[in-house]
Amino acid sequence: MADPESPWSQIGRKIKLEGLSDVASISTKLQNTLIQYHSIKEDEWRVAKKVKDVTVWRKPSEEFNGYLYKAQGVMDDVVNNVIDHIRPGPWRLDWDRLMTSLDVLEHFEENCCVMRYTTAGQLLNIISPREFVDFSYTVGYEEGLLSCGVSVEWSETRPEFVRGYNHPCGWFCVPLKDSPSQSLLTGYIQTDLRGMIPQSAVDTAMASTLANFYSDLRKGLRKA
């Protein structure tokens, strides 16, 4: 859970009470937080999982008692298509095997919304289905795009799901300099799954989930 003094802990209430004027400042802070993650030196990361086309690293999170994960791999598609498949929209459920539902609860502008999504159980249901309510923001970054998000406090709950919490997370996607039809996709994820789960199960699930994310996304892009 977020530190009570963390600026992220009251984001949901701020969005509801202060409206769009505050959403702009939240968007900027979220973007800057992800850019800070993107500038973390290589020697601070430890490899958590490495497969043919994806590497996943981790380091202790500064937001909660868990890990910040970094994942990176090359996608055989242009930036806009890659990000359009990741951010809230019609394509995400077509390819993401972990996600079971996605609804936009509030739409602020074209690139900014609050969404609710659910995920399937993992590790033979040691990790039961989860629900997340996230503020999502997509913005230009260098020659590409950044799609980022953070969980918000939302009063409506559903008893069949455990409410998880995403600390600031996001996906940087930029064209390869020598092959602009391909994109380098780099993700930063720090999810508090909450509930009574062994930490070893969380660590196994997170690294595998990120590797599978790239595999599933590649398949989805080929079908598009």
Swiss-Prot record:
Gene3D superfamilies: 3.30.530.20
Keyword Oxidoreductase: no
Keywords (A to Z) from UniProt: Lipid transport, Lipid-binding, Transport
Domain of life: Eukaryota
Alphabetical list of SUPFAM superfamilies matching this protein: Bet v1-like (SSF55961)
SMART domains noted in UniProt: START
GO-annotated cellular components: cytosol; endoplasmic reticulum; mitochondrion
Residues making up the signal peptide according to the UniProt record: none
Occurrences of domain START (ranges): 16-224
InterPro entries: StarD4 (IPR042555), START-like_dom_sf (IPR023393), START_lipid-bd_dom (IPR002913)
GO biological-process terms attached to the record: intracellular cholesterol transport
Reactions performed catalytically: cholesterol(in) = cholesterol(out)
Induction pattern: Down-regulated by dietary cholesterol.
Molecular function in Gene Ontology: cholesterol binding
Tissue: Expressed in most tissues, with highest levels in liver and in kidney.
UniProt effect for mutating K41E: In strain: C57BL/6
Physiological role: Involved in the intracellular transport of cholesterol. Binds cholesterol or other sterols.
PANTHER family: STAR-RELATED LIPID TRANSFER PROTEIN 4
Protein name: StAR-related lipid transfer protein 4
Gene source species: Mus musculus
